[in-house]
Amino acid sequence: LQDFFSQCREYAESIGWQFHVYWYGVGSNGGSMDLGSSFGSSKQDWLWKNNKQVVDMYMLNYDWGYSASSSASYAEQIGANPYTLYAGYDIQGNWLARGPWSTLKNTKMSIAFWGNHTTNMIYQNSSEFGSGDEAVQACYLEKQEQVFSGGNRNPAKRPAIKDGISSSSEAAMNNFHGIAEYLPARSVLQELPFVTRFGLGNGKTFRNEGKVTFGNKWFNVGVQDYLPTWRWWITDDSNNVPEDGIECGFTYEDAWYAGSALHMSGATKVSNVRLFKTNFDVSETDDVS
């Protein structure tokens, strides 16, 4: 199987295709079960064999903390990119607690969340504000922002790195440093024109040019817009986080198209809100509206 993966990769590259394999690293070179959480000579053939890359992602089992550094070093030693090793987090069973985040700060390694075969675990933990549709959605959006941007929901104001956060409660997540501590923003926005109306893909009504065309609840991820890269990167003119920073979020009470819109509220002296990371080739003839 290892040789098959390598051959598929080589052939795909020869015809301009991409071939990707993501592998949960609980097997030995020979194929027997090995639940150890380190990467070494007994497992190396699943990532790198005969000086060829075998899989694109090799996720370490969840107790990788004590061996993270040696696993990354061994990957480099055999010629592999250490960032093809992924530190696994079992967020279904342990939320964000099982692996030591502090270890990853100085380790060349990527991060993988294992959740559930059928359910987004952030959504699964989003009943804290109530069980109604709007309450669950509001909680889900906030927890998304805490997971990725940190407990303050602003990547420019991340809490210190903290291990052992086993609860998904708002209070516990207020102390989480966020994935932004480790992962710089990337962008799929490559070309103009670019249009977003901040539609989440659901709503209490459906609007077109601001007018209600369907008066009932709905959802359709196919009409979800591109949503902000950063939620919410807010600074003043000195790149400091303002004490009176504007509040940002989404509202279902109004929309230009679909079911939601960007909502900003509060009184602020200066709040610069960065929304999207882009790779546009902008010219003097382009317009922003």
List PLM regions with ranges.
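Chitinase-like catalytic core of GlcNAc-active glycosidases
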Residues: 1-70
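Structural preference for beta-strand elements that scaffold enzyme active sites
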Residues: 18-22, 57-59, 82-88, 110-112
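Extracytoplasmic/secreted cell-surface and envelope-processing proteins
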Residues: 30-35, 66-72, 95-100, 120-125
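Acidic (Asp/Glu)-rich catalytic clusters
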Residues: 50, 75-81, 104-106
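Glycoside hydrolase catalytic-domain groove-lining segments
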Residues: 67-90
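Substrate-binding cleft of secreted/luminal carbohydrate-active enzymes
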Residues: 85-245
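Short carbohydrate-recognition loop motifs
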Residues: 243-280
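Extended repeat-based interaction scaffolds and adjacent low-complexity, acidic/S/T/P-biased segments
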Residues: 288-289
